[in-house]
Curated annotation (Swiss-Prot):
Protein name (database record): Collagen alpha-1(XVII) chain
Membrane-related topology note: Single-pass type II membrane protein
Biased composition (Basic residues): 1486-1497
Subunit relationships: Homotrimers of alpha 1(XVII)chains. Interacts (via cytoplasmic region) with ITGB4 (via cytoplasmic region). Interacts (via cytoplasmic region) with DST isoform 3 (via N-terminus). Interacts (via N-terminus) with PLEC. Interacts (via cytoplasmic region) with DSP.
Chain positions with Phosphoserine modification: 544
Source organism per UniProt: Homo sapiens (Human)
Residue intervals on the Cytoplasmic side: 1-467
GO CC field: basement membrane; cell-cell junction; collagen trimer; collagen-containing extracellular matrix; endoplasmic reticulum lumen; extracellular region; extracellular space; hemidesmosome
Sugar attachment sites: 1421
Length: 1497
């Protein structure tokens, strides 16, 4: 029956199973559970029947008890003998692995249990059928098996052993970890597979390899495991480890198969000795180490194969008894364990003369010996069998011991001379059984000396002289101790005598002291004189103490009189004594314990980090081979060099030339690398250009082979560069083409934004006349965005979806490809894009939406705003021609992006999608416009961030239908040049530009439509769920803050509407957007008046108030705030105001959407991460709350919206802050592709640009103002407009910020102004203070409203706290109007249209910035500020929100890390994808490592 005991060892529960012979358990498949497990079972008593043999203990050696553990018999047999039962049997042994079947796994193999359990060695059985009989025959069989198992007959051959040790898996790793002696046994032996019957169980031990019965095989840990550890179970090694493993046995002998060895050494402790033994099979080895306990053993040594080696090295001392034996003898108990199981064959060449003791085959494991796992308890010293039994306990477990002893002596017979069978008789068998010793020695069977005492653990292998020697040594040791004690006692005695003497002296002196005291006392009392006289007379002549004291007293008195006695202070000196303590310093040496470091292994986890580096490794490159990577490859130029070898691929490059159309030229220069790169690079681009066909070539061998280099290959892309790219554009869906168009535009746009815009602006101005002249130019412009947006219900937006092609961006910047996705939505707008003409207005679009209405007709003229218009041009699509022209400008922005913002790519992107659609293409152009608007226009490069926001306008896309005119989209194709934005290949990101959505505005293109129409359209559009979702979505995030409403201003100041209005007006004027045209008719007063209208004000308040709540937290819900504002309403109001003023703003706004595509948040993040601002990125994360707005992001990023609004001029209301803020984040994305590369390649330049952008009044104002709101405060939810702004900002900011930050701090950085805005608002304002003091933002901002002050204190900074100071008050509609006007002007957002309304959305923008704003609190040194801020606060993260935010971006963030792989940095654009790839690679590498690791274990 099985009895199972459960012990807890080391906290683990071990179950020992004692199997009654009845059952055998098959460990077979698993490593034993038993105690080994822990190692120490300390106790383990096995209980077992009989005897119990607790063995146990064994240190917990886990010997496990084993003890008989075995089973059944345990009882009977007396344990140890039982031992053969294997109790020892390593119970733990790996039983595991080995069949051990029995064993029950439990420690003990149970050893024999099973029939074998008989005291004899059933073990011998090895395969043991159930038979216990360990007949010699069986031994012979086993030997035969072992031999047959090995290739050579002697598997013990040294070579085999070496081989095993070397690589072998051969088990046991350990390869003899221990002493060298043990050799591992070849694994093969093990196979045998013979199945041992379960019954054989005992066998189990049989490790003998042979057996190992099939089950084992399964385990057979054997090798494999690394030593010791290896399974825990695995003894082996055990070795010290042993401990665990428990020793044991661990080795369990064996590693299987032999080799457990090593064990030995096992810690001694572990007593194991064990270890040793192990040797497995044959190796007797070990054995001994037994070592008693102590260390002992260890030794173990055991030689392997038959080498007896072993001898116990163990210190004999200990336990001596135990140790020894080495020989088979059980010797060490633990040994025996192994033996038992292992039955070591000595193998040593089978031929070896039996004489070697080792030789004892001990074939059976049992050897009876010891079974005891014995580990030794120390004590163990040998015990006689009986003694053992008794001793066992005494030994406490030590007993382990020997117990095995015997087993009756193993007597070993020399069989084959080499093996001896040891019959073990029961204990009773009389210790000698004669066998023991004789067998032991020389295996001569009798051995001249006769058997060793039955109780001798290694009785069969020890000679009498060995025992004698052991005893002698022991006695010597004892004598040494005795003498030492005697000497000590003598010393103590002397010390005592000395002490007594001192005590006596002290006592004798005390009396004198007393006497003296009395005398002095008397003298002092006047008695002294007489005494003095006496002393004088007496002098010292008298010997009496009294006289002496008198003399002394007199002397003292004199001294005292003389004041000489004053020495008293001296006492302090005593303190010095402590000094000695200093010596203790030495203890410091204990540091040595450091070794515990072993736990270090866990360190591997750290490896994961290292894995990151691997990501960089070529493997990733391979992925690069993948088509996708190839595209990224473009950035690869450097890589291309290598690929250049692939000259062949270069051929594809030729194809590229067509694509080159111009842009190729630039890359052509890169071409030089191209030659090399051409093959690969070209191939890559080819893919893009061809849209697959070329790509194919790219994929061709060149890329594949280079795969690893793939990264470089990416650089190769330059080679592809224009050529393939061009082609790809056309070939590809054309999307690439679209981007291409953008690209060209990008360059123009770049300039355009600045100069052109100005010019355009003029035209824009004309726009006003346009109304008059509507028939004339205005008409054209009109077509563009302004009306378009309203015009197109946005249904076209659906078409816009094609905009998605924006992805084409890929062609431009593979990295950005992803970004395109977002544009996709705008893409829908794309179809409308043709009408793109309105596109120009697009920029203003988002914000414009509301304003757009006003701008409507007039906007046409704003169209001129060409610069932005350019982006808008796409929308103007109708104009087709103009659209193209415009797109050109956008291109510039693209380039601009390349320089500072990824924006560049964005514009191209939009065209790209349109390109394919052709019709839509036009929208694409518009998309550009939109982007431009973002880049804006006022922001020009910086606006680029804004572009993203444009995405929101996407909704207008519906109008897009008119967009069909989109033909201009073709110009978009020019985008290809965007290549120029190389640095900003990210521009591809912009491909998002596809946002075609803006295109929709195109429909409105009919500038003719009156401002009313536009207004209505915008209003509808704005109000429409689609647009709202965009606007709100983006801005929304900030919205949440709304709740805090209380804060009137971010700064906490009341919002000054006058300030705002003036701001708006000035903005409109500064923007030079048709504002001036209209501005004549519009004045800040006008806007103010409009804003102040109760209905307007109420409207603003209702939305803004809530938002107002600085509560940045609400920011999370930011969407809500944004949503809360009815931009349509606001825009309609403002527009109506404007229109009433005679201001008609184009609908340019719509184009804005393209911007959205801009960079993806991830891209932005990547870019930022790569940039010095990377700190910013992380921090932004905090705005977790904004995450909510994130939804909006899905289609449009807050940044996108913000930028869109920004470009549209929408931002003004929110106060400049809003729009910009969001854009900021987006911007980075825009930049991400280009920026990332750009930043990487031109970090300084980029930084300068970024800073300049951020510092630009427009951006700053946007960035700065809004951020304030985010400030925590605001809970009160005042309904100040500003508060709205603030809350909105805050929400927005928060959201935006988080977004932006999340999106990319880079933008955020710029936005940081936004944060700054908060600061400005927060001059004293909640945000500034609350945030300032409180939050990282606050901190930055905190001082002086931080941002606000630094930023001129105004949301717009220019106003210097306009928002800050002004916002504090209730919304001052005048202020608001002014601000809106100014903002719009400044941004040029209103150029096309004055969507003041959008302004509100803008607010959210600011929030985005906050994260960064701090950093930029002073534009003068944004970088420094950012650095300081981050260093000081890590602040950006500081915002608790961060985690939330970060979480969302986080994933992408991870890629960011991949960014490092970014090394390809230049390839950066590709880098993004590459990063992903890298990541994969990393993982891959990680896996490899893991795999390796797995193997090692």
């Amino acid at each position: 029956m099985d009895v199972t005991k459960k012990n807890k060892r080391d906290g683990t529960e071990v179950t020992e199973r004692i199997v009654t012979e009845t059952v055998t358990t098959r460990l077979t498949s698993l490593p034993p559970k038993g105690g080994t497990s822990n190692g120490y079972a300390k106790t383990a008593s096995l209980g077992g029947g009989s005897r119990l043999e607790k063995q146990s203990l064994t240190h917990g050696s886990s010997g496990y008890i084993n003890s008989t553990g075995s089973t059944r018999g345990h009882a009977s047999t007396s344990s140890y003998r039982r031992a053969h039962s294997p109790a020892s049997t390593l119970p733990n042994s790996p039983g595991s692995t080995f069949e051990r079947k029995t064993h029950v796994t439990r420690h003990a193999y149970e050893g024999s249990s099973s029939g074998n359990s008989s005291p004899e060695y059933p073990r011998k059985e090895f395969a043991s059928s159930s038979t216990r009989g360990r007949s010699q025959t069986r031994e012979s069989e086993i030997r035969v098996r072992l031999q047959s198992a090995s290739p050579s007959t002697r598997w013990t051959e040294l070579d085999d052993v070496k081989r095993l040790l070397k690589g072998s898996r051969s088990a046991s790793v350990s390869p003899t970890r221990n002493s060298s002696n043990t050799l591992p046994i070849p694994k093969k032996g093990t196979v045998e597979t013979k199945i041992v019957t379960a019954s054989s169980q005992s066998v189990s031990g049989t490790y003998d390899a042979t057996i190992l019965d099939a089950n084992l095989p399964s385990h057979v840990w054997s090798s494999t495991l690394p030593a010791g550890s290896s399974m825990g179970t695995y003894h082996n090694n055990m070795t010290t480890q042993s401990s665990s493993l428990l020793n044991t046995n661990a080795y369990s002998a064996g590693s299987v198969f032999g080799v457990p060895n090593n064990m030995a050494s096992c810690s001694p402790t572990l007593h194991p000795g064990l270890s040793t033994s192990s040797s497995v099979f044959g190796m007797q080895n070990n054995l001994a180490p037994s070592l008693t306990t102590l260390s002992h053993g260890t030794t173990t040594t055991s030689t392997a194969y038959g080498v007896k080696k072993n001898m116990p090295q163990s210190p004999a001392a200990v336990n001596t008894g135990v140790s020894t034996s080495a020989a088979c003898t059980t010797s060490v108990q633990s040994d025996d364990l192994l033996h038992k199981d292992c039955k070591f064959l000595i193998l040593e060449k089978d031929n070896t003369p039996a004489k070697k003791e080792m030789e004892l085959l001990i074939m059976t494991k049992d050897s009876g010996k010891v079974f005891t796992a014995s580990p030794a308890s120390i004590a163990a010293t040998s015990f006689s069998e009986d003694t053992l039994k008794k001793e066992k306990q005494a030994a406490y477990n030590a007993d382990s011991g020997l117990k095995a002893e015997a087993n009756g002596d193993l007597k070993t017979v020399s069989t084959k001379g080499k093996t001896t069978t040891a019959d073990i008789h029961s204990y009773g068998s009389s210790g000698g059984g004669g066998s023991g010793g004789g067998g032991g020695v020389g295996g001569a069977g009798g051995g001249p000396w006769g058997p060793a005492p039955a109780w001798c653990p290694c009785g069969s292998c020890c000679s009498w002289w060995k025992w004698l020697l052991g005893l002698l040594l022991t006695w010597l040791l004892l004598l040494g101790l005795l003498f030492g004690l005697i000497a000590l006692a003598e010393e103590v005695r002397k010390l005592k005598a000395r002490v007594d003497e001192l005590e006596r002296i002290r006592r004798s002196i005390l009396p004198y002291g007393d006497s003296m005291d009395r005398i002095e006392k008397d003298r002092l009392q006047g008695m002294a004189p007489a005494a003095g006289a006496d002393l004088d007379k007496i002098g010292l002549h008298s010997d009496s103490q009294e006289e002496l004291w008198m003399f002394v007293r007199k002397k003292l008195m004199m001294e005292q009189e003389n004041g000489n006695l004053r020495g008293s202070p001296g006492p302090k000196g005593d303190m010095g004594s402590p000094g000695p303590k200093g010596d203790r310093g030495f203890p410091g040496t204990p540091g040595i314990p450091g070794p515990l470091g072993h736990p270090g292994p866990q360190g591997p986890k750290g490896q994961k980090g290292s894995v990151g580096d691997p990501g960089m490794e070529g493997p990733m490159g391979q992925r690069g081979r993948e088509g996708p990577m190839g595209p990224r490859g473009e950035a690869g130029p450097p890589g291309s060099g290598e690929k250049g070898e692939r000259g062949a691929a270069g051929e594809p490059g030729p194809h590229g030339p067509p694509g080159v159309p111009g842009s190729v030229g630039p890359k052509g220069s890169s071409g030089s690398p191209g030659p090399q790169g051409p093959p690969g690079p070209v191939g890559l681009q080819g893919l893009r250009g061809e849209v697959g066909l070329p790509g194919v070539k790219g994929d061709k061998g060149p890329m594949g082979p280079p795969g690893p280099k793939g990264d470089q290959g990416e650089k190769g892309p330059r080679g592809l560069t224009g050529e393939p790219g061009m082609r790809g554009l056309p070939g590809a869906v054309g999307e690439p083409g679209a981007k291409g168009a953008m690209g060209p535009a990008g360059p123009d746009g770049h300039q355009g934004p600045r100069g052109e815009q100005g010019l355009t602006g003029m035209p824009g101005i004309r726009g006003p006349p346009g109304p008059s002249g509507d028939p004339g130019k205005p008409g054209l412009t009109g077509p563009q965005g302004p009306q378009g947006l309203p015009g197109t219900p946005g249904r076209p937006g659906i078409k816009g979806e094609p905009g998605a092609p924006g992805k084409i961006v890929t062609s431009e910047g593979s990295s950005m490809l992803t970004v395109p996705g977002p544009p996709g939505p705008p893409g829908a707008m794309g179809p409308p894009g043709p009408p793109g003409a309105p596109g120009p207005a697009g920029p203003a679009g988002l914000p414009g939406h509301q304003e757009v209405l006003n701008l409507q007709g007039p906007p046409g003229p704003p169209g001129p705003r060409g610069p932005p218009g350019p982006s808008i041009p796409g929308p103007p699509g109708p104009r087709g021609p103009p659209g193209e022209g415009l797109p050109g400008p956008p291109g510039p922005p693209g380039s601009f992006l390349s320089n500072s913002e990824t924006f560049l790519s964005g514009p191209p992107g939009p065209p790209g999608p349109p390109g394919p659609k052709g019709d839509q293409g036009p929208p694409g152009p518009r998309g550009h416009q939109g982007e431009q608007g973002l880049p804006g226009f006022s922001t020009s490069g910086s606006s680029s961030f804004g572009l993203n926001l444009q995405g929101p306008p996407g909704p207008p896309g519906p109008q897009g239908p008119k967009g069909d005119k989109g033909d201009p989209g073709v110009p978009g194709a020019l985008g290809i040049p965007s290549g120029p934005s190389e640095g900003g290949s990210s521009s591809t990101m912009y491909v998002s530009g596809p946002p075609g959505p803006p295109g929709p505005p195109g429909p409105p293109g009919s500038i003719s439509s009156s401002g009313q129409e536009i207004q209505q359209y915008i209003s509808e559009y704005m109000q429409s769920d689609s647009i709202r979702s965009y606007l709100s979505g983006v801005q929304g995030p900030p919205g949440p803050p709304g709740p805090p409403g209380p804060v009137t201003t971010i700064t906490g100041e009341t919002f000054d509407y006058s300030e705002l209005a003036s701001h708006v007006v000035s903005y409109l004027r500064t923007s030079g957007y048709g504002v001036s045209l209209f501005s004549s008719s519009i004045s800040s007063e006008d806007i103010l008046a409009v804003l102040q209208r109760d209905d307007v004000r109420q409207y603003l308040r209702q939305y803004l108030m809530g938002p107002r709540g600085p509560p940045g937290p609400p920011g999370a819900s930011g969407d809500g705030s944004l949503l809360s504002l009815d931009y349509a309403e606001l825009s309609s109001r403002i527009l109506s105001y404007m229109s009433s003023s005679g201001i008609s703003i184009g609908l340019p706004g719509p184009p804005g959407p393209p911007g959205l595509p801009g960079t993806s948040y991830e891209e932005l993040l990547s870019l930022l991460r790569g940039s010095e601002f990377r700190g910013i990125v992380g921090p932004p994360g905090p705005p977790g709350p904004p995450g909510i707005p994130g939804n909006v992001w899905s289609s449009i990023s807050v940044e996108d919206l913000s930028s869109y609004l920004h470009t549209a001029g929408l931002s003004f209301i929110p106060g400049p802050p809003g729009p910009p803020g969001p854009p900021g984040p987006r911007g980075p994305p825009g930049v991400s592709g280009a920026l990332a590369t750009y930043a990487a390649e031109n970090s300084d330049s980029f930084r300068s640009e970024l800073i300049s952008y951020l510092t630009s009044p427009d951006v700053r104002s946007f960035i700065v103002g809004p951020p304030g709101p985010p400030g925590p405060q605001g809970p009160p939810g005042d309904s100040r407009l500003l508060s709205t702004d603030a809350s909105h900002s805050r929400g927005s900011s928060s959201s935006s910020h988080s977004s932006s930050v999340r999106r990319g701090s880079s933008y955020s950085s710029s936005m940081s102004t936004g944060g700054g805005g908060a600061g400005s608002l927060g001059a004293g304002g909640a945000f500034g203070e609350a945030a300032g003091d409180r939050g990282p933002y606050g901190t930055d901002i905190g001082p002086g409203g931080g941002y606000g002050a630094a930023a001129e204190g105004g949301m717009y900074a220019g106003n210097g706290g306009l928002l800050g100071a002004d916002f504090a008050g209730d919304l001052d509609y005048n202020e608001l109007a002014v601000r809106v006007s100014e903002s719009m002007q400044r941004q040029g957002l209103l150029q096309g249209m004055a969507y003041t309304v959008q302004g509100p959305p803008g607010q959210p923008g600011p929030q985005g910035p906050p994260g960064i704003s701090k950093v930029f609190s002073a534009y003068s040194n944004v970088t420094a500020d950012l650095m300081d801020f981050f260093q000081t606060y890590g602040a950006i993260q500081g915002p608790p929100g961060q985690k939330g935010e970060m979480g969302t971006p986080g994933p992408k963030g991870d890629r960011g890390p991949a960014g490092p792989p970014g090394h390809p940095g230049p390839p950066g654009p590709r880098g993004h994808k590459g990063e992903k790839g890298d990541k994969g690679d990393q993982v891959y590498a990680g896996r490899r490592r893991r795999r390796s690791i797995a193997v090692k274990p």
